[in-house]
């Protein structure tokens, strides 16, 4: 049903690969998010929470570099550990503090000086503009649904994103105490589509802003497009709602491997939530970003 649509949408949907590290963690944490392009001028949209992570990475990294610079000034003597403890208090570092975030835009543009971001004041929506690139590495751009009255309960739609990161082209440099991207390893993760039926609509202050689907949006699909069987874009995945079903099972005895075990289960229904196409188009118009529509 969505074969041709996925092929079409994949031409302008791209992953953002991220590698994170906590102060007390010994392993690097890979993650992915999704953006998709709306024109041939380097404009893309994604979730505001994704954009905030991208924007916040620089400050997080600068803060840790300042910490390292001060730490290097300590003499390696009996007072070293005590001095480092004081420095940790100064920078408010604890084992769970995020100290490094490295991001990599995959197959978007050749090079760039940076990006400009416009975040929606209330919705989980943001515009990203790639700056000073020479060549685009995406082949097409989104076509948004022109008449949103066609979106009705029971309509089957699809989302595309990168929820299961498999890239491993990064390493930890113990000498510099830093995360580094490498030329070795896997630089891409497979795209992952997931379908769902339109169940309800989301509104606030009598203003429609979202579409609810019968299946969850997965971690890493945030910022990815919601589209129909033609590849026409209806919205953008931004979160998943968890509804308690009330079918609770407490200490029920069942047979497991020829033995009796007690189990408990609390069931939830996981529903995807997407920003409505009309809200996206209104935000693009507000910032005078060119986009395209189709029936």
Across the structure, where does each feature detected by a protein language model lie?
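Conserved catalytic-core segment of clan PA serine endopeptidases
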Residues: 2-8, 27, 61-137, 146-148
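Catalytic histidine site
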Residues: 12-83, 131-133, 160, 227
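Catalytic nucleophile loop of clan PA
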Residues: 36-37, 216-237
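Conserved hydrophobic positions within beta-strands
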Residues: 37, 112-116, 198, 226
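Conserved active-site neighborhood of the chymotrypsin/trypsin-like protease fold
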Residues: 42-54, 105-169, 207-208, 289-295
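C-terminal subregion of chymotrypsin/trypsin-like serine protease catalytic domains
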Residues: 44, 228, 232-295
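Mixed-charge, low-complexity intrinsically disordered segments
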Residues: 55-96, 169-183, 243-255
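Flexible, gly/ser-rich surface segments that form the specificity/activation loops bordering the active-site cleft
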Residues: 142-209, 217-221, 237-251
């Amino acid at each position: 049903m969505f074969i041709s649509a996925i092929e079409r949408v994949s031409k302008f949907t791209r992953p953002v690969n991220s590698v994170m590290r906590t102060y007390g963690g010994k392993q690097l944490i890979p993650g992915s998010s999704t953006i998709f392009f709306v024109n041939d001028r380097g404009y893309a949209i994604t979730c505001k929470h994704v954009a905030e992570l991208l924007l916040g990475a620089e400050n997080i990294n600068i803060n840790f570099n300042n910490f390292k610079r001060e730490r290097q000034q300590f003499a390696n003597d009996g007072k070293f550990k005590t001095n480092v403890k004081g420095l940790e208090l100064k920078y408010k570092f604890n084992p769970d503090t995020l100290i490094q975030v490295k991001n990599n835009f995959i197959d978007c543009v050749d090079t760039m000086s940076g990006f400009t971001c416009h975040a929606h004041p209330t919705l989980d929506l943001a515009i990203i503009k790639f700056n000073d690139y020479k060549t685009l590495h995406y082949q097409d751009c989104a076509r948004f649904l022109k008449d949103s009255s066609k979106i009705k309960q029971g309509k089957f739609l699809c989302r595309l994103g990168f929820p299961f990161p498999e890239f491993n082209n990064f390493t930890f440099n113990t000498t510099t105490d830093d995360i580094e991207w490498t030329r070795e390893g896997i630089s891409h993760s497979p795209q992952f589509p997931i379908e769902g039926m339109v169940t309800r609509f989301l509104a606030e202050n009598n203003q429609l802003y979202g579409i609810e689907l019968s299946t969850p949006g997965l971690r890493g699909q945030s910022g990815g497009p919601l589209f129909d069987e033609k590849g026409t874009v209806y919205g953008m995945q931004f979160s998943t709602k968890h509804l308690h079903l009330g079918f609770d099972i407490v200490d029920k005895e069942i047979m497991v491997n020829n033995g009796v075990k007690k189990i408990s289960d609390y069931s939830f229904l996981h529903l995807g939530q997407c920003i409505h196409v009309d809200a996206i188009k209104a935000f693009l118009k507000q910032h005078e970003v060119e986009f395209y529509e189709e029936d």
